[in-house]
């Protein structure tokens, strides 16, 4: 997507009208992002949810977390973050369930059960979908962040996100573009950021809380991850990892690890990279993939049941770090045009 007109062209006025009608007709609404939420998932849930709460004060609106984990520390500054509740603790049968930043229902984790109890389902998303799971979907694959779609939808409905709510949406945009350093940071993304700042969003607060407030314990873990970086495929693929025991030894929680993949991505000459984090006693892993160019790492994530974009994707896998690397690294080598058989796993 090269300009804001492209974003407008993928928005159907009819679908938006029908979504608004569902919102207006619902007495109870539940909104959720994906499992292991990032800034865009949380910012989109909060931006949409808080806006609807202000515009429709008599509606029962629940803001859900797909997991039982707490809100990641770096995102707790956002307005309304204290309103987010685990989907497993929500017992309602909402008239309307709204999914944001979720391409497949499996990524809803515990929120999928709430979806199944709902009368109607709506989806806002910017990922490609293998199949639609919602009654109505406002899907714009070219948008840099789901927060952009939420902002445009609200504006088209006559609802303007301002100040703290606008900051939530800006956080989604900033984090999903890697501080406007990824390939998706196009003219439309900058235009959306300008709109949000004009409406009171605070970019300095986003930068401070998300990127400039690291705990010393996290920096110790970061140094471990940096020390483990390896490259394969003639330096075109990089990877690193952290065991659950590393997090425990450093005093770091799992939710603080968002962003460690960018340490691996920063290696000169690397085209794609992988960061793995051990969970559940290192019997499972969560993986983050990044690409510096046009190579599509979401294809790799899809092989593990995950998803994402060309430049950024994630997945979970039942297996150890070594086992996951043994499968993923040959795929990444093939993606960059190198011989998969040449790859050996080093820990």
Regions found by a protein language model. Name each.
Residues 49, 78-83, 139-142, 291-292:
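Short, hinge-like loop/turn segments at secondary-structure boundaries
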Residues 2-35, 43-76, 91-96, 175-303, ...:
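Hydrophobic helix-and-loop "lid/oligomerization" segment in the mid-to-C-terminal part
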Residues 86-88, 110-113, 137-140, 158-160, ...:
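A generic local secondary-structure boundary/capping motif
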Residues 47-49, 114-117, 139-140, 191:
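Glycine-rich, phosphate-binding/catalytic loops in enzymes
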Residues 2-18, 113-121, 142-144, 148-150:
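An acidic intrinsically disordered interaction segment
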Residues 124-193:
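Short alpha-helices
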Residues 35-37, 102-105, 127-129, 244-245, ...:
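Short glycine-rich anion-binding loops that position phosphate/pyrophosphate groups of nucleotides
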């Amino acid at each position: 997507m090269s300009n804001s007109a492209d974003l407008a062209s993928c928005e159907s006025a009819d679908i938006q009208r029908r979504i608004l009608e569902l919102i207006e007709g619902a007495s109870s609404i539940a909104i959720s992002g994906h499992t292991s939420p990032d800034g865009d998932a949380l910012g989109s849930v909060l931006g949409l949810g808080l806006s609807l709460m202000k515009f429709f004060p008599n509606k029962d609106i629940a803001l859900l977390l797909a997991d039982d984990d707490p809100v990641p520390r770096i995102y707790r500054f956002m307005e309304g973050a204290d309103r987010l509740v685990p989907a497993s603790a929500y017992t309602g049968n909402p008239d309307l369930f709204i999914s944001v930043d979720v391409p497949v229902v499996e990524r809803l984790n515990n929120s999928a059960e709430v979806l199944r109890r709902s009368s109607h389902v709506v989806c806002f998303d910017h990922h490609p979908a293998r199949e639609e799971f919602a009654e109505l979907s406002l899907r714009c694959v070219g948008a840099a962040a789901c927060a952009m779609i939420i902002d445009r939808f609200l504006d088209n409905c006559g609802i303007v996100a301002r100040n703290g709510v606008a900051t939530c949406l800006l956080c989604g945009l900033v984090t999903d573009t890697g501080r406007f350093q990824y390939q998706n940071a196009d003219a439309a993304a900058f235009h959306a950021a300008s709109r949000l700042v004009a409406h009171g969003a605070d970019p300095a607060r986003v930068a401070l809380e998300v990127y400039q407030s690291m705990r010393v314990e996290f920096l110790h873990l970061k140094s471990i991850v940096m020390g483990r970086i390896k490259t394969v495929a003639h330096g075109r693929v990089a990877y690193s990892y952290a065991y659950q025991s590393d997090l425990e030894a450093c005093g770091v929680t799992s939710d603080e690890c968002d962003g460690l993949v960018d340490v691996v991505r920063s290696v000169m000459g690397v085209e794609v990279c992988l960061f793995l984090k051990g969970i559940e006693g290192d019997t499972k892993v969560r993986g983050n993939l990044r690409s510096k160019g046009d190579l599509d790492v979401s294809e790799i994530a899809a092989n593990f049941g995950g998803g994402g974009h060309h430049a950024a994707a994630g997945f979970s896998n039942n297996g150890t770090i070594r086992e996951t690397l043994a499968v993923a690294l040959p795929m990444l080598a093939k993606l960059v045009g190198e011989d998969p058989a040449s790859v050996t796993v080093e820990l």
